[in-house]
Regions:
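Exported/periplasmic cell-wall-interacting domains
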Residues: 2-51, 78-79, 86-100, 133-139, ...
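Short, surface-exposed loop motifs enriched in S/T, G, D/E and P with embedded aromatic residues
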Residues: 71, 125-126, 142
């Protein structure tokens, strides 16, 4: 289950515009590192995107959350095709409508995963910061939300903004293209950002790992 056919990145604005062309290599991503469910537990079909991999009660893996409570995973989306810059998958079929929303960002794999009640409902290829403007790691509560935020620091629009730090690091919609990076924010495709914005709330936890 490969979720990205890799590439290089270059500097782009914290919003959606380009600021420069400094090129270097970054690793390609890989799927979430979780144990496979027992063979006798079949995957459940959940719609046009394929199947959901479910874990039996008592055998669910957990994902560490530095500075926060580990996330117990009940099911994952099965993504059988490579994901490229700008790609995302969103599928809530078969997932309870109630449950805490948790967001995980894996910088090394360039992936975001959105969970509700321990079930993965969305995943996307992301942009993140440069060595000079890195994306911070740790677990952060969502401090503020704005459907359309105008950055005064970079004079750029940041649609569907979820602010994570007091110095302006946020998740927001961006042009997720090969060769682009951010000034420390997490950039995600706009339609995916709209869905994340709609399912998240102030105080929900976002874990970012290197």
């Amino acid at each position: 289950m490969s979720r990205l056919a890799g590439g290089a990145i270059a500097l782009a604005a914290a919003g959606v515009g380009a600021l420069g062309m400094a090129w270097w290599s970054r690793p390609a991503t890989a799927p979430l590192s979780l144990p496979a469910p027992r063979a006798e537990v079949p995957a459940t079909t959940i719609g046009s995107y394929g199947t959901r991999v479910s874990y039996p009660a008592g055998r669910e893996p957990s994902l560490a959350a530095p500075g926060g409570t580990p996330l117990l995973v009940h099911s994952l989306l099965r993504v059988d095709r490579p994901m490229h810059f700008g790609d995302y998958v969103w599928n809530e079929s078969g997932v309870p409508a109630e449950g805490d929303t948790r967001i995980r960002v894996d910088l090394s794999r360039q992936l975001m995963s959105v969970f509700r009640g321990g079930h993965e409902i969305g995943t996307a290829v992301i942009l993140y910061g440069t060595d000079h403007k890195p994306t911070p790691t740790g677990t952060f509560p969502i401090l503020a939300r704005a459907r359309l935020h105008q950055s005064t620091l970079y004079d750029a629009e940041m649609p569907y903004m979820l602010r994570l730090t007091n110095d302006g690091v946020a998740i927001h919609a961006s042009a997720v293209r090969r060769g682009y990076a951010t000034h420390g924010c997490v950039g995600i495709p706009e339609d995916f950002a709209r869905r994340v914005f709609g399912t998240s709330a102030r105080g929900d936890l976002v874990t970012i790992t290197a």
